[in-house]
């Protein structure tokens, strides 16, 4: 990731050093502009620097810098476009990592207003609030309405979704255990996806085991600059994952955005000497299913004859992995798959803050436009939050691929 984004550096949270690095990266982006059409961050960056003398990013005011940084919602599209990611140390650019450092600096040096800090903290804890039982869940819902304009879509199904028994006994004779990390997003907003995952795994002889400490990957705290809390979550999760490895259990992470955070940031922010080995053991559901006996030979996975095709929405976050495995699993199960790539809409509820409403709404509209002309074909996406937002926009259900595989 580069020494400039190494949190153990003494000047990592220093305002002058951080703003100097932000200006350097902005200058590189201004001269490059290959990411101009990826999201609204870069048009604002270019417009702001255009108004500076000699187009010098160092002349941006702190407020202008902060406004550009706060607009980023970690979709990671810029990383795949950037020709400077692999440049030598001191010249490399990693915009998402810069945003993490800049936001951490703002929080550490008390540049956030009380309203901003409260809003960020509520968003970071929203999944926890929505996991509460009534009547406390009602209080969590009111907090969510206060901090995001997308609350109606997120809360739409909460009254109809009941706590479901997610324990499923394996349906085959040979049984082995898998450590399943559903993530707080699935727990709070899409528990049916967790149930579907365990139903599908049961069909290949895998019994899902969930540790008591498995809840959140820490992404909301990382993205809002709460590095201290993020480190605690990383330490707890790495400890739990290491125990699973010692018991010989594969580790499956339910959401692509959470898996991305673990692979990209855990080694950087963890002091555990085993963290690199732990990260190497993390899998998404498709890596796991691809490794077991092919499900194509199991009639429980076969498609329904009346609906043989589906559209797979693939976010920019998910596409940074081996993006062929999900498609391969679906095709082995008999589906004809059409992949439509798109910019990541929201991997955590934190990304739905009011200051990012226009950006997220624009992405939802863009993805909806890509789906024009899609008739009765099943539409699936790995991102549970994206599914909720698109379901409200399209007035048709967008499901998780595992829900499709789990259907009888």
What are these regions (language model features)?
Residues 9-30, 60:
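Asp/Glu-centered strand-loop micro-motifs enriched in Gly/Pro and often flanked by an aromatic residue
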Residues 9, 18-19, 52, 62, ...:
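General secondary-structure edge motif
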């Amino acid at each position: 990731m580069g020494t400039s984004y190494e949190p153990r550096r003494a000047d990592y949270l220093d305002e002058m050093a951080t703003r100097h690095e932000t200006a350097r990266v902005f200058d590189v982006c201004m001269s490059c502009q290959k990411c101009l059409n990826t999201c609204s961050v870069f048009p604002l960056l270019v417009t702001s620097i255009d108004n500076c003398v000699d187009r010098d990013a160092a002349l941006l005011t702190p407020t202008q810098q902060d406004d550009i940084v706060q607009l980023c919602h970690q979709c990671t599209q810029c990383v795949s476009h950037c020709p400077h990611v692999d440049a030598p140390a001191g010249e490399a650019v990693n915009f998402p990592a810069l945003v993490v450092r800049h936001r951490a600096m703002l929080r550490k040096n008390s540049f956030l207003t009380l309203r901003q800090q409260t809003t960020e903290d509520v968003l970071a804890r929203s999944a926890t609030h929505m996991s509460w039982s009534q009547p406390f869940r009602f209080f969590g819902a009111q907090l969510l309405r206060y901090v995001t304009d997308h609350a109606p879509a997120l809360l739409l199904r909460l009254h109809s979704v009941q706590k479901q028994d997610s324990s499923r006994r394996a349906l085959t004779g040979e049984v082995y255990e898998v450590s399943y990390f559903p993530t707080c997003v699935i727990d709070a907003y899409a528990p049916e996806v967790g149930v579907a995952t365990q139903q599908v795994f049961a069909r290949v002889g895998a019994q899902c085991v969930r540790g008591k400490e498995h809840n959140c990957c820490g992404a909301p705290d990382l993205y809002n600059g709460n590095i201290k809390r993020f480190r605690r979550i990383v330490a707890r999760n790495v400890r739990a994952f290491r125990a699973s490895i010692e018991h010989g259990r594969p580790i499956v992470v339910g959401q692509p955005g959470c898996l991305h955070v673990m692979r990209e940031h855990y080694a950087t922010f963890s002091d555990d000497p085993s963290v690199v080995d732990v990260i190497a053991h993390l899998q998404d559901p498709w890596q796991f299913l691809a490794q077991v006996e092919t499900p194509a030979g199991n009639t429980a996975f076969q498609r329904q004859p009346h609906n043989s095709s589906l559209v797979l929405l693939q976010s920019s976050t998910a596409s940074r992995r081996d993006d062929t495995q999900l498609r391969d699993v679906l095709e082995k199960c008999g589906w004809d798959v059409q992949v439509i790539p798109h910019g990541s809409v929201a991997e955590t509820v934190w990304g739905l803050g009011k200051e990012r409403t226009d950006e997220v709404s624009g992405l939802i509209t863009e993805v909806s436009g890509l789906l024009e002309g899609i008739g009765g074909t099943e539409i699936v996406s790995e991102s549970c939050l994206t599914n909720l937002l698109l379901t409200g926009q399209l007035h048709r259900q967008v499901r998780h691929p595992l829900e499709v595989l789990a259907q009888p």
